[in-house]
A protein has these predicted regions:
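Polar, enzyme-active/binding microenvironments
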Residues: 1-300
Length: 300
């Protein structure tokens, strides 16, 4: 700010250090294609494939920044599920029952148990969503209704029911997303893809593309500052979004896809995977150190 009395201009400078991934504690239940949301120190891993990807699990675990602990099971085991919220108030929605069958089931977490809520208008799995959404406001977009059919329809959640409101420009499945219900980014998807679209609360706009095409990635952050990491085929790369462009930063220790993700651009979390060789219960923590200082400039 500028002080008219002293003729001094004070500026705030933020300096970012080198970003890194480091190992965290393993999940109790190995899984992939699960819902993941929360923060680096308070994350949720919900349902998904089990150890050998031969069946789905009802298991729900929470991460406290140092270890995972089991909580109450969900009502319906599923994979290809997405979610949003916190460890005290979460929401999961959509599912793949088998390669040719999907569902629109919704469940809400109240810090004690899961309860069944209204289903989506269009059943789908492997969709895009806003990981920073809440139990009162979030969205689901695109995904799959069959292995070869991808709806472009978007639905918003108001705490009670789903409503169709808009369509994404390019329909696809296995896309990742970050942000909130009125301001979000979705990236990548089937093929794999480099496509990125931005949501402003009323419509979707295609914006700057990813550097590396990917699908089945995880993501974290807000519309103007986010991360996309991992993805198929067994990608380790992390890309950071600054509101206008993507920059490749630190790689995961192990490339993986169908992983869960949560957190921010400076403190993210990656957990689980579809590929057995990548450690289906492995957790990695992303850290991008930053320092903030004030600079005073005299005005002549």
């Amino acid at each position: 700010y500028y002080n008219t009395t002293t003729n001094l201009l004070k500026l705030t400078k933020t300096v970012f250090g080198t970003a890194t991934w480091s190992s965290g504690s393993n999940m109790g239940t190995p899984r992939g294609s699960h819902a993941g949301f929360g923060t680096q120190s308070a994350s949720s891993a919900v349902s998904g494939y089990d150890q050998d990807a031969s069946a789905v699990t009802v298991n729900y675990e929470e991460y406290d920044g140092s270890s995972w602990s089991e909580k109450a099971n969900v009502n319906t085991a599923r994979y290809g599920v997405v979610g949003c919220g916190t460890t005290t108030a979460g929401l999961i929605y959509g599912q793949v029952v088998n390669p040719s069958t999907v569902g629109g089931l919704t469940e809400e977490w109240n810090n004690t148990s899961w309860s069944v809520k209204n289903v989506m208008n269009t059943s789908r799995g492997n969709s895009g969503t806003a990981g920073g959404g809440t139990t009162e406001a979030t969205f689901v977009v695109s995904g799959q209704v069959s292995p070869s059919s991808f709806p472009s329809a978007m639905e918003t959640w108001n705490g009670t029911s789903w409503t169709e409101v808009s369509e994404i420009n390019t329909a696809r499945r296995n896309l990742s997303g970050f942000g909130v219900s009125t301001a979000a980014i979705v990236a990548g998807g089937t093929s794999p893809s480099i496509l990125v679209e931005s949501w402003n609360g009323s419509s979707w706009t295609e914006i700057t593309e990813l550097n590396t095409a990917a699908e089945e990635s995880a993501a974290s952050g807000i519309q103007t500052s986010g991360l996309v990491f991992g993805g198929a085929p067994n990608i380790a790369r992390t890309e950071e979004w600054n509101g206008s462009s993507w920059t490749e930063v630190a790689d995961l220790a192990t490339g993986r896809n169908q992983l869960g993700g949560s957190g921010t651009t400076t403190a993210g979390l990656a957990f689980g995977a579809e590929n057995p060789s990548g450690g289906r219960n492995a957790t990695e923590e992303f850290t991008a150190p930053q320092s903030i200082s004030n600079v005073t400039v005299a005005s002549s």
